[in-house]
Regions:
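The substrate-binding groove and active-site-proximal loops of carbohydrate-active enzymes
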Residues: 163, 212, 244-251, 267-277
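Glycine-rich, acidic and aromatic/proline-enriched surface loops and short helix-turn segments
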Residues: 178-182, 213-234, 289-296
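Well-ordered alpha-helical scaffold segments within catalytic/enzyme domains
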Residues: 206-217, 259-275
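Carbohydrate-active catalytic/glycan-binding domains of CAZyme proteins
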Residues: 207, 242-245, 250-258, 295, ...
């Protein structure tokens, strides 16, 4: 709600006499240390392909399934609500398809203050969306030039490319490239759009190798290996999702095996031995845990959960 904005509060001459004074509080838990990798940023901008009027709203096609947000030129009167609803597909009648989002709202709402300078734009700061299509409502006379699509991903070099004479293969590679960059969000997540967006280990057990052909993912996977290690239980069990926002400690082999496989990839592709050295105690502890609880006298592991799903 732009009507509640504080104005130029970042400037030295801002009158903050009505602010509450700062208070001393307890330090947060956790370990204070330098960030291991760059953060997310806007790495590319796209122009919308089309905007079609549909009743009292508009449907915008960005031309590409991506992760990021839409920046728009602010229009309207004070109190007007501009609403952007994001989706990856359209229904047969041209409406946006949102069933795959489950209970994720995937919506940005901006309330016009009436004080915005001419030509001012707005985009969200604390959320990203996975989308190609956008349903726009509350926006007067929407035109493509009023909107800019901003692609958001972890800041890292794009180091590889591929092209051949087969158009289908080229498109498969292009789809993979966009899928990977859309899921690099401080860690490799499983999707950028629905109500999940979780760093599942198994999805990247082998995926990390192919990803490194196109992205310099050295720092990110080194950081994620630490996340996995720090999510390990005292008994050696490694979760299926790390950081363990979802409490999935199912004691299988294929998903936790991602930790040694990441370390192997970082050594093989980048010549970096440190992840192996740093994570070896955790890997050894996990192997000992599996051997103690789930290995028969014939060296057969009797426990698993997901099988070859997503691997």
């Amino acid at each position: 709600d732009a009507r509640k904005e504080l104005g130029n509060w970042t400037q030295t001459d801002y009158d903050d006499t009505k602010w509450m004074p700062a208070e001393r509080v307890s330090i947060p838990s956790g370990t204070l240390r330098a960030q291991m990798m760059p953060g997310m940023k806007v790495t590319e901008t796209l122009k919308p392909v089309s905007i079609q009027k549909m009743g009292d709203k508009y449907i915008m096609d960005t031309g590409q399934n991506l992760a990021g947000w839409v920046r728009f030129r602010i229009k309207g009167q004070a109190g007007d609500s501009i609403r952007l609803h994001f989706a990856e597909r359209l229904e047969s009648d041209g409406e946006i398809f949102t069933k795959n989002l489950r209970d994720a709202h995937c919506t940005d709402i901006y309330v016009v203050s009436g004080r915005e300078p001419q030509g001012a734009t707005w985009a969200p700061r604390f959320v990203y969306h996975g989308f190609r299509y956008v349903e726009i409502s509350g926006y007067p006379d929407a035109k493509t030039e009023d909107f800019v699509v901003e692609v958001v991903e972890d800041e890292m070099d794009h180091t590889g490319s591929f092209s051949c004479s087969d158009k289908t293969l080229n498109q498969v590679v292009r789809n993979a490239f966009w899928g990977i960059r859309s899921n690099y969000k401080g860690m490799p997540v499983d999707c950028p759009q629905r109500n999940e967006r979780q760093p599942w280990l198994g999805d990247h057990a082998m995926g990390c190798w192919g990803e490194s052909m196109f992205f310099d993912n050295h720092a990110m996977y080194n950081k994620w290996a630490r996340d996995i290690r720090e999510a390990q239980r005292e008994d050696g069990c490694i979760p299926d999702v790390a950081p363990a926002y979802w409490n999935y400690y199912s004691d299988n082999v294929t998903w936790p095996a991602t930790l040694p496989l990441i370390c192997d990839m970082l050594f093989t592709n980048y010549g970096d031995m440190r992840p192996i050295e740093d994570n070896y105690p955790a890997i050894k502890k996990w192997v000992s845990h599996i051997r103690e609880y789930y290995m028969t006298k014939d060296y057969i592991i009797t426990k698993d959960k997901y099988g070859d799903w997503c691997v």
